[in-house]
């Protein structure tokens, strides 16, 4: 299978680059910026992309790729910081020039070049840089400019080195997808054979080669990711997989029963339901910080699994988790800053007795869904809404109590039921929609009496891969009806508000 290697210099969009390449049916893999030449040769990529980053290439602590990368005779595309690294390492010069700083949407003038094939020459791109290339290496020429940045793109056609100061991976660069397509297909000459059926076969073989004759304990959370991971692993190793579903009391209405029924149907045997509602509530008592909630839940999950594993009396070696790419992104990579820890990657204790098995960790959400369909998981289950591993604990702001959980659980059920009915015949249904119980109270009126209840937030977004999201524009008349239904049917709710924050700057979940 042809692949594109992406060297990660810590930029916030590195995983988005990988996502865009995979959209083109080309496998992409993210590796550390300082990967050895031997390892690159072993991976045998058709092309290399150098990601953006936070540093300045001329700084004392700047990070650079292995120098041998320029002699591999492999096409290379540098993006933002990656472009500047390419220029400096090949004899060019980069400086901080206040007059050439650019942030946001920027008009750009392209020249005729294979990188810009089938692209309008007068166009618009997304810039985010304070440093600029001021002197080109020998053999390079300028192929794009803006009013402030004379070297917005450059190339050495003989070596097949290309660089852009802007970000083609973000949707704000209107021609970005076409540029990436030109690079991978026209310049790198890839086959384009990255498809769900290939993912399935590759992942099954990967699991078999890792697990061999050992046993796997699966951590089922109730979400799409852990379900797909479990069914995939079951097809790979059969009866050596044991699934444990922990009811931590933080699930949506009727979810525990629905998940267990589905697991028995899809996997069959070795399914264990563990009721630990009171344990999790006791551990979370008095905790208000969202990071602490996530870590406590992750740690408690592992403690429960260790006890269950001992009771089952099977020599488990691996713990299966449904970690996917966005989970890892938001928990911070080698150089990027942590947005929030993920329960699968940020809360595990050092004494963990299992080795982790995470077959989905390099897949995006829509790729996981496609994989799920190829595994014959029913469509309605594959395309159910994303639900965080910590469950309603991160949808109740402040301290977790049984009363608060019941409030947000019932409100969430009413909201989701209304939206499901409203958009049942529409192709433009929100990607994710849920309620958040804030820790704020406000005065209301019930009948002739004063009330003092919680403020509930409604959240609905449109997204493809959870890397970015836009708030969904539910018609106002329906928001009014939803508010009325919730306030009338759910006790202790006196006010309903609608969250209109995109991601970025916000995250999809509130905590």
UniProtKB/Swiss-Prot annotation:
Keywords: ATP-binding, Glutamine amidotransferase, GMP biosynthesis, Ligase, Nucleotide-binding, Purine biosynthesis. This is GMP synthase [glutamine-hydrolyzing]. Catalyzes the synthesis of GMP from XMP. Pathway: Purine metabolism; GMP biosynthesis; GMP from XMP (L-Gln route): step 1/1. The gene is guaA. HAMAP family: GMP_synthase. GO terms for cellular component: cytosol. The active site is at 80 (nucleophile), 167, 169. NCBIfam families: guaA_Cterm, guaA_Nterm, PRK00074.1. PANTHER family: GMP SYNTHASE [GLUTAMINE-HYDROLYZING], GMP SYNTHASE-RELATED. Residues 194-384 form the GMPS ATP-PPase domain. ATP binds at residues 221-227. It is an enzyme of class 6 (ligase). GO terms for molecular function: ATP binding; GMP synthase activity. Homodimer. It catalyses: XMP + L-glutamine + ATP + H2O = GMP + L-glutamate + AMP + diphosphate + 2 H(+). Disulfide bonds: none annotated. Pfam families: GATase, GMP_synt_C. It comes from Malacoplasma penetrans (strain HF-2) (Mycoplasma penetrans). Residues 3-193 form the Glutamine amidotransferase type-1 domain. CDD domains: GATase1_GMP_Synthase, GMP_synthase_C. Its EC number is 6.3.5.2. InterPro entries: Class_I_gatase-like, GATASE, GMP_synth_C, GMP_synth_GATase, GMP_synthase, GMPS_ATP_PPase_dom, Rossmann-like_a/b/a_fold.
């Amino acid at each position: 299978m042809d692949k594109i290697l992406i060297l990660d210099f810590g930029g916030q969009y590195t995983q988005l680059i990988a996502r865009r390449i995979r959209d083109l049916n080309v496998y992409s893999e993210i590796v550390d910026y300082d990967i050895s030449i031997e390892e690159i040769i072993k991976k045998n990529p058709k092309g290399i992309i150098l990601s953006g980053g936070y540093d300045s290439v001329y700084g004392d602590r700047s990070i650079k790729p292995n120098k041998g990368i320029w002699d591999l005779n492999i096409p290379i595309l540098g993006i933002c910081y990656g472009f500047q690294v390419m220029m400096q390492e090949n004899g060019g010069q980069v400086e901080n020039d206040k007059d050439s700083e650019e942030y946001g949407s920027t008009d750009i003038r392209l020249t005729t070049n294979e990188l810009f094939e089938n692209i309008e020459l007068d166009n618009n791109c997304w810039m985010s840089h304070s440093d600029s290339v001021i002197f080109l290496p020998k053999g390079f020429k300028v192929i794009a400019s803006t009013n402030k940045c004379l070297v917005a793109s450059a190339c050495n056609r003989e070596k097949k080195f290309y660089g852009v100061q802007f970000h083609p991976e973000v949707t704000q660069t209107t021609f970005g997808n076409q540029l990436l397509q030109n690079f991978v297909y026209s310049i790198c000459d890839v086959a384009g054979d990255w498809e769900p059926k290939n993912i399935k076969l590759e992942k099954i073989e990967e699991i078999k080669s890792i697990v061999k004759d050992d046993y796997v304990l699966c951590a089922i959370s109730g979400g799409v990711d852990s379900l797909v991971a479990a069914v995939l692993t079951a097809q790979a190793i059969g009866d050596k997989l044991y699934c444990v579903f922990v009811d931590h009391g933080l699930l949506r209405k009727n979810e525990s029963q629905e998940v267990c029924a589905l697991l028995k149907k899809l996997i069959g045997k070795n399914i264990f339901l563990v009721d630990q509602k009171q344990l999790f509530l006791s551990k979370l008592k008095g905790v208000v910080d969202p990071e602490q909630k996530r870590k406590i839940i992750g740690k408690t999950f592992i403690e429960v699994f260790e006890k269950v594993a001992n009771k089952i009396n099977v020599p488990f070696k691996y713990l299966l988790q449904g970690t996917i790419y966005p989970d890892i992104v938001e928990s911070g990579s080698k150089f990027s800053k942590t947005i929030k820890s993920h329960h699968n990657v940020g809360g595990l204790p050092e004494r963990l007795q299992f080795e982790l098995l995470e077959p989905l960790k390099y897949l995006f959400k829509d790729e996981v869904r496609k994989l799920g369909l190829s595994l014959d998981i029913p469509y309605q289950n594959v395309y159910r809404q994303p639900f965080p591993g910590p469950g309603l604990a991160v949808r109740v702001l402040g301290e977790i109590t049984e009363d608060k959980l019941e409030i947000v659980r019932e409100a969430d059920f009413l909201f989701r039921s209304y939206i499901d009915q409203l958009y049942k015949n529409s192709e433009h249904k929100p990607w994710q929609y849920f309620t958040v119980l804030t820790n704020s109270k406000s005065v209301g009126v019930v009948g002739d009496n004063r009330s003092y209840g919680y403020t509930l937030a409604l959240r609905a977004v449109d997204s493809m891969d959870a890397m970015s999201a836009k708030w969904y524009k539910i018609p106002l008349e329906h928001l009014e009806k939803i508010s009325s239904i919730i306030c009338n049917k759910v006790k202790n709710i006196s006010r309903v508000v609608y969250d209109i924050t995109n991601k970025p700057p916000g995250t999809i979940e509130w905590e």
